[in-house]
Amino acid sequence: MTTHNAFKTILVTFFIVVGFYSCEKEFATVAASGIVDTTAVNFKSTYSKYIIRSKTLKLNPVQSNNLPIALIGNYNNPEFGSYNTEFVTQLRPSQFNPVFADTLENLTIDKVILSIPYFSNEIETLESGETIYELDSIIGNKENNSNYNSINISVFESNYFIRDYDPSANEPNVGQKYYTNKSNGNSNISDLELQKELLLEINDLYPNPSEIQIRDQENDSIIDRKSPRIYVEFDNLEYWRTKIIEKQGEQELANINNFNNYFRGLYFKVTSDSDQGFIATINTNQADIEIQYSVKSNVGSADESVTKKTYNLNLSGNKINFYNNALNIPDNDNNTMSISGTDGSIGVLELFSDEMIEHPFDDNLPDIS
């Protein structure tokens, strides 16, 4: 055992000595500024400098259907140009085959309310119970640094059928795509189809950060509070009675396919004369139309009573966002880039062109910032 261990010690020592000897010619002196020894030849290389070119390209229309949110409004940015955003959406009834009343003659519509929440954050709750909010996801011009300039919105019943599947696809069950330029990729969507009947005009709308307080009509007490939102009543109650209530027991309210073919959706069109407004990202999955109605029971008897009820049409169906943007695309020779979202613009840098700088060690490169 002693002889074997001694042999191992000699063998290990031999390899260590050989290792030091083989590395002797690879040593190089390292100074504070880097390797300076002429033996470190592997660290030398040549380089070239090229002109970097920049340009801005307008994006093609992008797919904009089946999203949980929507953009609405108009806005003019002095750097990027003007934006106008609108959308059309399907509706989803809160209940199919509804029974509004045993006798529709005893039913009266009280209110029909459009409710579309803004995105907002709770800041604090006061002792009075009022919640203070801060609005989120809104861009635009503020008047006197206080509030955004207002916009006008017209709400139409749409006669355009939004398909779930693409009939021109080579495979079954391929989803239909719709684009920001009012098209499905093959044909355009006409305003005539989108504007079947005007239902509501919302004038001088601006994003108010205050909570919505729902009050009792008899004693004016607060019975409900809602986060900041578009909250507007429809004037034409007879339209909703004919369109929805009187379809009780009919096939139009039997299932979602029948309903979408019957009531094809709502089109929200920005009708402001000025482009100095705002654009809001709205939470359409939480938006709805609420039909508030009263039903009389035991009419003409001593037990006659009135029951308050509601029926909701949610704006959570398939929707298409439309963008009509007039962007300021900068001159591609001015070494600037303009990058904008939606179907806006992208910046492109050409890093390795064929054109080399004549004096590769000249650091006076073009300023593209």
Predicted features, each with a name:
Residues T2-S369:
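Secreted, disulfide-rich extracellular signaling modules
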